[in-house]
Amino acid sequence: MSLFDTINAGGAQLLGVAWPTVWALVRILVVAVVILLCVAYLILWERKLIGWMHVRLGPNRVGPAGLLQPIADVLKLLLKEVIQPSAASRWLYLVAPVMTVVPAFAVWAVIPFQAQAVLANVNAGLLYAMAISSIGVYAVILAGWASNSKYAFLGAMRAAAQMVSYEISMGFALVLVLMTAGSLNLSEIVGSQQHGFFAGHGVNFLSWNWLPLLPAFVVYFVSGIAETNRHPFDVVEGESEIVAGHMIDYSGMAFALFFLAEYINMIVISALAATLFLGGWDAPFEFLSFIPGIFWLVLKVFALLSVFIWVRATFPRYRYDQIMRLGWKVFLPVTVIWVVVVGFWMMSPLNIWVK
């Protein structure tokens, strides 16, 4: 019996019918706290990694090797005043930052950390993740409109167009995973990658979806960078034109909530990419399967997050027309064509996804 099963059994015996509700709240709280800690140290890792790429040290003053820098940043933002523009729509202005964070947290309800370790093991998990993650764009539009600033509104309109453009390609990439796995349940999608010729010979990583669905994996990940408005797709907050875009009139914790949502969404995109294309909690080789699955998932997510940061430090920002062209004229045709190719592949004698 695992530790979680032991706690669950003991709690049920102690609290009776109230235990399921208490246990659900405890799990949600634990996941939320872990995500917040991950965001704090992801920001530190980003600053450190970019510093090394620029041949400098990065944060190294607060705590040993700068490890307490995230705590100092949080305290600074908590103590700053939230200044509201006089012409802003008061309630909408305050609701927008909260509305952008809530969907980012809500997606984690269906992401499995390892076998049987998921907050809500629903059969439509992939559909839920796609739907919830799309809500964030409304918060961005709301922030741009409520600020009553032409620069904020311009940034919000850019965000809306960019997110809609890349969500279509991302959706087709996920349709490919659905076709091959035959399920919307994220745990079952991971399970579908654990069989095949290579997995049968102990080389698990060659049976994962990244290899047969490589174009879809690339499209999904790059679209994820665009969806999160990360460099080089950060025209929403283009510093040289509209400064911080929809966040230009926000300060203090209201401003920090937008950044919190951005980094949570980065982790969500990486976790979904690892789950859908990189085998989730599955070990790359069978002889390493004794290591707990959550270790492999965290390692894959960390590697993908490092790619996010590497892209930021390497590529110049695209023009807005280039971003639209990439989404509509490159990614969309590639994913549609690959859906057709995989469809014929699955109907042929060479079908590698036979259940």
Swiss-Prot record:
The keyword Transmembrane helix applies. Its EC number is 7.1.1.-. GO terms for biological process: aerobic respiration. It comes from the Bacteria. One of its GO terms (molecular function) is quinone binding. It is found in: Cell inner membrane. The chain crosses the membrane at residues 25-45, 91-111, 126-146, 170-190, 205-225, 253-273, 290-310, 330-350. It is a multi-pass membrane protein. NDH-1 is composed of 14 different subunits. Subunits NuoA, H, J, K, L, M, N constitute the membrane sector of the complex. NDH-1 shuttles electrons from NADH, via FMN and iron-sulfur (Fe-S) centers, to quinones in the respiratory chain. The immediate electron acceptor for the enzyme in this species is believed to be ubiquinone. Couples the redox reaction to proton translocation (for every two electrons transferred, four hydrogen ions are translocated across the cytoplasmic membrane), and thus conserves the redox energy in a proton gradient. This subunit may bind ubiquinone. Belongs to the complex I subunit 1 family. This is NADH-quinone oxidoreductase subunit H. The lineage of its organism: Bacteria, Pseudomonadati, Pseudomonadota, Betaproteobacteria, Burkholderiales. The gene is nuoH.
